[in-house]
């Protein structure tokens, strides 16, 4: 059987002579038309350090594909720097870019009849966007992560991007000198790679390795270290073998493999964004997976890894301690993941992990043994109540007591909330409500790292609650609840909260409640009027018009 199963539709036969002429113009030879055409979706960009080191990996992918007998076809995918856009109008485009990237991959693979695709990505939305595009196209595919960043150093301490956000709060509170503030700003990010903790990019890369769509050890390598280039060439070779075997993403991404990925997210203390993105990934794969499935996995999987933002270590430390294979083998030995899931290697999870010890090495404390976890249960809790009947997501690690009842401080945009924090108008015991920031209302469900970082910097991270229908950065920790659904713009109860109302956040009982009578809530609901759309044309207007609820992934192609 030919391995150019799809591309032969545009390269073979008399009628395709004009097509071949165009290929000849790019240096193709006649023999090349029998080889598979394999796309390389290249996310290289000088917009952000997360993506500024990707070109060498795209080049390595091309070399590996061609050495294995394929034709490599490079095309570009865009990126948004979440870190730079944070706290500005630009953050509204971040989640939008996930859909744009997915559309790019699906469109190029479909339009060019590619036989396979290798996606190279770095910044946060590159990850789910690329995976969604691969699943929609459903040709043999592999994800190559651009690698994590190494830590910065100052006064003997490791630094990362979140160090700078938290320094803003410390400096404005008068708890940090200008010299220290400037040095942290200059030293936090020493080179290329994605933000170094178990933030969104590293969470998603780790999950993709567990899912079976990336090679073992691929998710925690540093961008600036040499092994990542050789690893990319190996990924390209493996992809060509998958093309020969016709092993497709939807053969790999199943309900059981998604459960494996979510188990690893819980075990590593990963980002709240993983909930939103895996709902979207499951939708792209045609797999039934709901927000309640995250809670089901959370209750049985412990947090094993001591990783930032709520722990001590960075992704590169996890890599040196055994990486995701060690985390997975520890979970597999405890019966907490499925060993029979097929992976892009053509082998099962159990086969890939056969040479990995059942327990972590004793000479490290990044990965805990199953008998001595960081926490007995996972950290991403799904809260429900009259404020979030469809669900909301709380990250509960690092908190002495993940519950609070206090007066609401209500803000209809992020900027006014941040200004109130900076002006020291927020007190311990308050519950901040940031609303009209959901998929429809934001639009684009922006992340709230600036306010949460400022709260932590002012020493209020555990004593002030913050709820929002927007999202949080993977670098966020504290008494925070995001993805509140239904969102304010859709008439959710969060739109009805008034200044001073009592609100309860309780991660013990998984409750998020507005402590107001049902009669009063009904009265307010009857008086509520939907706000006018903030945008009436362009990409943000399209997103606001078509995005589903956060509780179903905020996707644009859920038409039922």
UniProtKB/Swiss-Prot annotation:
Pfam families: ILV_EDD_C, ILVD_EDD_N. Keywords: 2Fe-2S, Amino-acid biosynthesis, Branched-chain amino acid biosynthesis, Iron, Iron-sulfur, Lyase, Magnesium, Metal-binding. Binds 1 [2Fe-2S] cluster per subunit. This cluster acts as a Lewis acid cofactor. Gene3D superfamilies: IlvD/EDD C-terminal domain-like. Pathway: Amino-acid biosynthesis; L-isoleucine biosynthesis; L-isoleucine from 2-oxobutanoate: step 3/4; Amino-acid biosynthesis; L-valine biosynthesis; L-valine from pyruvate: step 3/4. Its cofactor is [2Fe-2S] cluster; Mg(2+). Mg(2+) binds at residues 82, 124-125, 447. Its EC number is 4.2.1.9. The keyword Nucleotide-binding does not apply. [2Fe-2S] cluster binds at residues 50, 123, 195. The modification N6-carboxylysine is found at residue 125. GO terms for molecular function: 2 iron, 2 sulfur cluster binding; dihydroxy-acid dehydratase activity; magnesium ion binding. The active site is at 473 (proton acceptor). Functions in the biosynthesis of branched-chain amino acids. Catalyzes the dehydration of (2R,3R)-2,3-dihydroxy-3-methylpentanoate (2,3-dihydroxy-3-methylvalerate) into 2-oxo-3-methylpentanoate (2-oxo-3-methylvalerate) and of (2R)-2,3-dihydroxy-3-methylbutanoate (2,3-dihydroxyisovalerate) into 2-oxo-3-methylbutanoate (2-oxoisovalerate), the penultimate precursor to L-isoleucine and L-valine, respectively. Belongs to the IlvD/Edd family. PANTHER family: DIHYDROXY-ACID DEHYDRATASE DAD, DIHYDROXY-ACID DEHYDRATASE, MITOCHONDRIAL. This is Dihydroxy-acid dehydratase. The lineage of its organism: Bacteria, Pseudomonadati, Pseudomonadota, Betaproteobacteria, Burkholderiales. The gene is ilvD.
